[in-house]
Amino acid sequence: MLFSRSILRGMPKAGIPKSPLALSASRNLRLANSVRFASDAASSPKSTTSKWKILKRTTLGLFATAVVLYGANVYRFRHPDPHQPLPDPSKKTLVVLGAGWGATSILRTIDTSLFNVIVVSPRNYFLFTSLLPSTATGSVHTRSIVQPIRYMLRHKSCYVKFYEAECTDVDADKKVIHIKKTTTDGVDLEQEIKYDYLVCSHGAETQTFNIPGIAEYGCFLKEIWDAQKIRARILHCLEQAQFKDLPAETRRRYVHTVVVGGGPTGMEFAGEMADFIEDDLKSWYPELADDFAVTLVEALPSVLPMFSAKLRDYTQSLFDSSHIKIRTNTALKKVTAENIHVEVKNPDGSKQEEVIPYGLLVWAGGNRARPLTKKLMEGSEEQNNRRGLVVDEYLKLKGYKDIFALGDCTHTAYAPTAQVASQQGAYLGQLFNKLGSLNFEKPSEDRHIALGDEMDSSTLISLANEKHASTKVFLPFKYSHQGSLAYVGHEKAIADIEVPWFGKQLHASGALAFYFWRSVYLSELYSLRNRTNVTLDWIRVKLFGRDISSL
């Protein structure tokens, strides 16, 4: 039996004939399988191709959308509304003094349909002061960081009157300000302007502490013409150092930059100057390459006191590697045409005098009150601080009716920075919007409060808060610190960033902080025009370097 099975197993099997229907089904099955295998083999490249098409179309769509939005913004910039409603005599008049951070923040926030708004400023533009150190060395053009004040005013809902003039006096009893403008012929034109509400945001002057010679021989860094003066002085010293064969000591003096002041402005300029020297001047003036020097002088024991100790140490080490000499505990006493005289405090407490030669002296000191601020101080006993105007929790000027103040002309618990002035301006803009709503709502249960012409802003605020005690229509100003930024050279920056949900500060330094610094400053620039120009300036410097023409 086993033998027969093995024989059968080895013999070929007889073929079993299949029906035509079975043969057709078999052929169809093989054809379907071959089609399926072919589609599987081709599915991978086709899928990849379709994904790339989707990505390409999405990218093109986003780019086209960005171009359209950019074009719309540019068109809006170039074509303000030619039919702004004119001032309404029935509305109250709000006068804003200045065109700085605080004033422009008010103008951004306020609803001009609620008031007849008048702006008075000696300059007809807003200056982005945070980038002034960059303009002094040519990293950014001066016109890239200014915005005409009329651009802001022409894009408001109602007409805003602007006077390019200086406010010389305030008559608080008559509610009148006196303004003066000097014509090109040297003639002084004067005018009076009546107000219902007045906002003093006229800023401050550079504090010199009565140091002899600082105003005559030093360069400040507060206005656009200061940056232009510094740049002209840099190039003048360079060419003068090469005019003829000079003693080595004299040549080194011409190319020695001294910066007095260890705050953010002084540190940023020192960093920008070091970049200018390393990236450009050493290439175009190779014979002076070994003579360039930058020294930073600070009277306090350390620089950048508003930053953390970790970031101060980082800046110190970076400046050391950049050959920027930081001299702390060194107070400026006198300035002459060629030297500065300083008093150095030694570790043992003793003091010694020292003379430092210089070619360019940049003074980055503090602020002092303008003449108008001093007059307002003298006009009320409640103005008892000589450093600036004293205000209450609503930024109302103490001792005066319907006068508010903000920014560098005031003395508060906050540092005199652009960040503080911007938040104060936004707060006052919202406060005036609420006051305007109280004054002009129809009908309103609050209207009987507002109709009293003799009621000043303090009375209105108090009555409104009493009537709505649960919600408090008017809240006191509260500053929210967002952090501190400073550029320290070599495409590096430092940043102390406040993170509310994190509960503490984040400290950043280096290249990452540098790009964060740039992104923040770009976002803070007033308009798309400013952002475009500054971005193009940065690209220009990266590609071609800084210009060294004496223009």
Curated annotation (Swiss-Prot):
GO terms for cellular component: mitochondrial membrane; mitochondrion. Keywords: FAD, Flavoprotein, Mitochondrion, NAD, Oxidoreductase, Transit peptide, Ubiquinone. Its main location: mitochondrion. One of its GO terms (molecular function) is NADH:ubiquinone reductase (non-electrogenic) activity. InterPro entries: FAD/NAD-bd_sf (IPR036188), FAD/NAD-binding_dom (IPR023753), NDH-2 (IPR045024), NDH2-like_C (IPR054585). It catalyses: a quinone + NADH + H(+) = a quinol + NAD(+); a ubiquinone + NADH + H(+) = a ubiquinol + NAD(+). It holds the Pfam family NDH2_C. Catalyzes the oxidation of NADH. Belongs to the NADH dehydrogenase family. This is Probable NADH-ubiquinone oxidoreductase C3A11.07, mitochondrial. It comes from Schizosaccharomyces pombe (strain 972 / ATCC 24843).
